[in-house]
Design a protein with these regions (language model features):
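Extracytoplasmic soluble-region selector
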Residues: 1-96
Length: 96
């Protein structure tokens, strides 16, 4: 992803919160290049009581300085010690 210094972007990843799954930052970007400034879970816009998708885990990122970095996320199941079910990697190039 290409950004200019000061620009902001939001990454939204679907997950099944009601099933116990959640996204976690496993490698944060270099803070001098990109920072995670907020994260949240947004519920579905479906009828109340609906189970499963499409909850979204949202990560707000801001470009803080020129350079290259990456963000790595994993979607983990509710079982302690279980391997991740999905991975997401985003590479950043930030210009002045």
């Amino acid at each position: 992803m290409y950004l200019g210094t000061g620009q902001q972007t939001t990454e939204a990843l679907r997950t099944c919160i009601s099933c116990g799954y959640s996204w976690h930052v496993v490698r944060a970007p270099a803070g001098t290049v990109v920072r995670v400034v907020a994260s949240s879970v947004v519920p579905p816009s479906q009828a109340p009581g609906t189970v499963g998708f499409p909850y979204e885990s949202r990560f707000v990122l801001r470009a803080t300085g020129a350079g290259f970095t990456s963000l790595c996320l994993e979607e983990r199941p509710p079982q302690q010690g279980a391997p991740p079910v999905a991975r997401y990697r985003l590479r950043f190039t930030v210009a002045r």
